[in-house]
């Protein structure tokens, strides 16, 4: 079984090792293989186009409380939202800018600094500085306040309960 197969389509251009995964997939008989994704797209590979497809739907989709905010100061608003959440509960902030993640951390009260982590690619360790972290054992969040960048957007299962703050910057 290959999970998040949509990631293979979008990232195979710059991650050649993903292409070999499909080669291994076809080594298995059709009854012993499957591809899974929540965001199905058409395949360019003719062999994959011939695969059986099953669309699964929720019987009772879970209800989520989603709040939408518009602002001219994303970093300040994000900092405020972090501080409004219960101090014992974990938080994930999805923001594809380490510079802005570090800026938000600076806007938090000093007592929160030790609770912050930036989960990003290995190539950004220096930019993340002392806040750099990876998922803990069992895919648990390493700190209470966790910023994640694009390398964690797909293909990563976080096995923890958390509040989610997603930041979209139209100017970037």
Predicted feature locations:
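Residues immediately C-terminal
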Residues: 7-10, 41, 154
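Conserved RecA-like helicase motor core of SF1/SF2 enzymes
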Residues: 150-172
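Loop/turn-to-beta-strand initiation segments
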Residues: 28-35, 142-146
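Conserved two-lobed SF2 helicase motor
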Residues: 1, 140-155
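SF2 helicase catalytic motif II
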Residues: 1-28
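Interdomain hinge/linker at the junction between the two RecA-like core domains of SF2 helicases
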Residues: 32, 38-85
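Conserved helicase motor
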Residues: 97-98, 117-132, 149-153
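Conserved strand-helix element at the start of the C-terminal RecA-like helicase core
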Residues: 81-109
